[in-house]
Amino acid sequence: MKSFVMTIALGMASSAFAQDVVLTNYPNWKMTDISTKGYKKEILFSKMNRDLIKVGASICSNRALVWAYDFKRNQNIDAGKLFLFYTKKTGEVGLKTWWYHVTPVINENGSVYAMDAGFPGSIVKPITPNEWLKKFAGSTNCKEIKANETDLIERMFDGYVYPSTTSYGTYDCYYTITPGGYWTPGSVAKGLLGVDEDGKPVHYVRDEIDNEEVYEACVEAVTSSVGRVLGGGKKRCKEYLGL
């Protein structure tokens, strides 16, 4: 079984002890080392909001964007995102078929941890990317999607599980790590390809979180589909996000 190997660079920041995580696909963006701000990953995890967000009913990408926004707003931490893409072998979850899952990730002393607070019954603390992949895909035989692998990136627009076997080999799942501002798989694809799902050129960069997107994500994360139709959550999200 192949282990999760994250393609990152560790760069020394202004502090002699800071180890910022720089992602290969996003070389101009750094994931903050929380230790330089006096934070511990366990404390940050315990403070993640699970009261406003409907943890059991919300979509992972919506709550992940809100939590990434919270890290930036409350602790001035630039968190990343870890996107997992399933194959037919790994995407069956009970009666459902998942094609992707996403969690915020943070950097502590140069090591990355998944902060998936959406499953309070089974995840009670930060876990390593390997542990997270094993938990949600049942495997760590996962391929990292690189910026030049356009055929794999284009699949992010489709909404279907990935093939196990491609020209890159045979894998149980795929993953990519992004800045925290990338909301959905489609947004990741737009950013890397420079085109939308119709092939039209776009300039889409989310090194910072977009306020309109996090507001929309919040409304969807705190209400049911019926509640959204009735306008539920809008006031709560504006107040909570400070927008």
What are these regions (language model features)?
Residues M6-I8:
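Sec-dependent N-terminal signal peptides
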Residues Q19-L243:
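A structural boundary/capping signal
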Residues A13-A18:
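N-terminal signal peptide c-region/cleavage motif recognized by signal peptidases
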